[in-house]
Amino acid sequence: MSSNTVAEFASELKKSPETLLDQLKSAGVSKAAPSDALTESDKQKLLAFLQASHGTATGDRRKITLTKKSTSEIKQADATGKARTIQVEVRKKRTFIKRDDVVEGEGQGAAPEVSAPSAEDQDLARREEEARHQAELIRHQEEELSAARREREERERREREAEERAAAYAAQQAEKKAQESAVREEASREAAAEAAARAAAQAEARAKAEAESKARAAEESARAADLDERRRKALAEAEAIRAMMAAPKKVLVAKKPEEPKPAAKPATAADAKKGTLHKPAATPGARPAAGAPAGGGKEVKSAKLSSSWAGDPAKKKEIKTRGDASGGVGRNNWRSGPRGRRNDRDEQSHQQAAPVEARVIEVHVPETITVAELAHKMSIKASEVIKSLMKMGQMVTINQPLDQDTAMIVVEEMGHKAVVAALDDPEAFTDEDVSGQQAEALPRAPVVTVMGHVDHGKTSLLDYIRRAKVAAGEAGGITQHIGAYHVETPRGIVTFLDTPGHEAFTAMRARGAQATDIVILVVAADDGVMPQTKEAIKHAKAAGVPIVVAITKADKPDANPDRVKQELVAQEVVPEEYGGESPFVPVSSKTGMGIDDLLEQVLLQAEVLELKAPVEAMAKGLVIEAQLDKGRGPVATVLVQSGTLKVGDVVLAGQTSGRVRAMLDENGKATKSAGPSIPVEIQGLSDVPQAGDEFMVLSDERRAREIATYRAGKFRNTKLAKQQAAKLENVFADMTAGEVKNLPIIIKADVQGSQEALAASLLKLSTDEIRVQLVYAGVGGISESDVNLAIASKAIVIGFNVRADAGARKTAEANDVDLHYYNIIYDAVDELKAAMSGMLAPEQREEEIGTAEIRTVFVASKIGTVAGSYVTSGQVTRNCRFRLLRDNVVIYTGEVESVRRLKDDVKEVKEGFECGIKLKNYSDIKEGDQLEFFEIKEIARTL
């Protein structure tokens, strides 16, 4: 008896399983879940219940329609013979009609007798129909299962065939690769043989080329002497022609000269053609000569020129044609083809060009100029300039920019005069604006720069003067920025610039010396003159400013001011008491000793200098420091040197410009204006300027933008030209250099000066084996674009007093980019040095571990030749390396394969014991040979 589940039966009846379960429960069939099995008796009970509930004699359901759909697959061969699987869907629809045999009009009594047999027959027919339906469903399920089984078997068969074909293809490919490798090896051997032959041929060709070059040099020297002689004769002839042109009415007699004309020789023609490169398009005398008859190629030049100088109007009005003007008559008055006419025409051009004197042009060469522009200025073809540069060893294109030095050398080589010029420079207008200002110069406060070695107390000295604690706020207690302050004293205002003393901040100290009037040289009494002290003295002397020496830490017990004076005298800083010009003042930043004397000496020097500057004028000054603030944008600390800077002024600073939106003093308070010698912080520039750039106030914002754009373009072109000039030199250096490891880094700092100093310090760490490669250096926080650049260049990112934003941190974590944060320059340099040390290849050293003497040699089966040895010193270990000495001469170096002691394989044998030693891949040993055993150890290297 067939059975299926409630869910399957519900899907056949197109009902939900829940509805079918309710009907089964009402029919007395206990089924709890859709997965329960249904038997044929359960279905009959359900059918009986439904018939009873709907009634059999009411006639409500007279017609039942059953729809059946089945899907099967058949395999059909197509035209190519391949078997294709076709899906076949069969739909069947059957309608069952219940017929009522009751005849209308018959009596009530007779009706049961007639209708009862009909109802039983109908029930029996219905049950038979349902049984047939169930059987058909079961048969359909069996067909589907068999079709699925056949499909699975067919799929497995196809997979097996595909695997067999793949294995056969792999074997075929392996065989093909083996054949190709054999062919490649044969080709490589042939290529090596060809390379050797080619190298020999090249060596022979080089030797021949050297001999030819020597011969060519001798020939060129002789040709140059001949050329000079011909040029001298041509100049003399040109002078004679000028003299004849002074009297045009005089008829010249045709007379054959004694020596041949310079224009008749090919070499002379080439020289004459070279001389005409600088000649204008039309010159007096050349155009009439072109119209002269060309009939007699051997005629005297004076006879030809006489007709042209006579000024024949018919000759002047003659139309120029592409052919010969003489009607095709050749040199011997015979008609000739196009070749003869061309030679005649060339001869005429040579005769015209010979007496022309080369014109020397004064070429104005800017900082950068392209090859095409340079050729245009010299009135020659660009190909001539390219040839000249190729002779100098530079491969250039017509649009390639040249730096000023290279361009001037080319101009001189071409026989012209080179003049340094900056034409069309919009900065010329700035001088006019400044020179147009007429303002009264008034006394101004001195600008004093405090310089000295690191940790000698510069910032602490300023702390006491300012009554502030600046040094405590600096990272590591060392200054890493230029600090600008102005202090009001009873005798006037003094502006102080505090420069870093660390060796990395050389550029900052140089900027501080250039912007200052007086230098306070700080030297610790207990430390003396140090390297940065000497450097500060050089900067001060180069700037030509007076030096006031402050001997700090004078209250310490181990202070020795006299030693400091002697060391400074050796550096040509002589104290006043020794007859010099520099006052020496011992001071203490803790007790305040000597501070007043120091300020008095500074103000005394300022009075001697008579410092003055205009006040009611547009401001000019110097950019001390610059940074990119996240909230405020580009911020620059500037020192006003003359004039008055106000909020709203248009400022030009280097390659940037902008309008001053806000101005703060050193205490962070807003101010409206700043006079001479006052440091302020300004906002509103278009970009971060370079520290050390000069700034000025202009009246026109448009002009300021133009000048800034011009400066940026000039800087970019100059940089590009210098890079191009250095490329050829670097090619050979890179070819000769070995395998050099690169350590790419990206630097982001809070201010321009710190970024510059950190980059210089890290680049100094480069060695012959490891090179620090600066991918990018900038000012501001670490952004996502910086991290993406680090991903592309595989660089590490160093942040100095800055941090990465959220997006940059997320990108760095996802791509394993190293982000390093520092606030002390010492730490950044030390950690990068340690990282570079880790990149160095370890050093391999040999360490001797023992020696042995071979006393006997025997051959063991399955082992080979064994050295019966006595360990004289140290020990011998398995797999250690050895040197075989015979008569104190090393004849072999190899590895010990095994060591045996009393037929036992051991790891080591110490001094004083005998053992058998098997040498790896070596058997030529004799009695009396010595064995030295050693190990190779790798030792980490440091920078």
Curated annotation (Swiss-Prot):
Compositional bias ranges of the Basic and acidic residues kind: 123-166, 174-192, 205-232, 313-323
Protein name: Translation initiation factor IF-2
Residue ranges with Low complexity bias: 193-204, 280-292
tr-type G domain: residues covered: 443-612
GO cellular component: cytosol
Region of interest (G2), residue spans: 477-481
Spans annotated as G1: 452-459
Function: One of the essential components for the initiation of protein synthesis. Protects formylmethionyl-tRNA from spontaneous hydrolysis and promotes its binding to the 30S ribosomal subunits. Also involved in the hydrolysis of GTP during the formation of the 70S ribosomal complex.
Highest taxon listed in the record's lineage: Bacteria
Encoding gene (name): infB
Keyword DNA-binding: no
UniProt region (G3), positions on chain: 498-501
Origin species: Paracidovorax citrulli (strain AAC00-1)
Pfam entry (one): EF-G_D2
Binding site for GTP: 452-459, 498-502, 552-555
InterPro entries: DNA-bd_dom_put_sf (IPR009061), EF-G-like_DII (IPR053905), IF2_assoc_dom_bac (IPR013575), IF2_II (IPR044145), IF2_N (IPR006847), P-loop_NTPase (IPR027417), Small_GTP-bd (IPR005225), T_Tr_GTP-bd_dom (IPR000795)
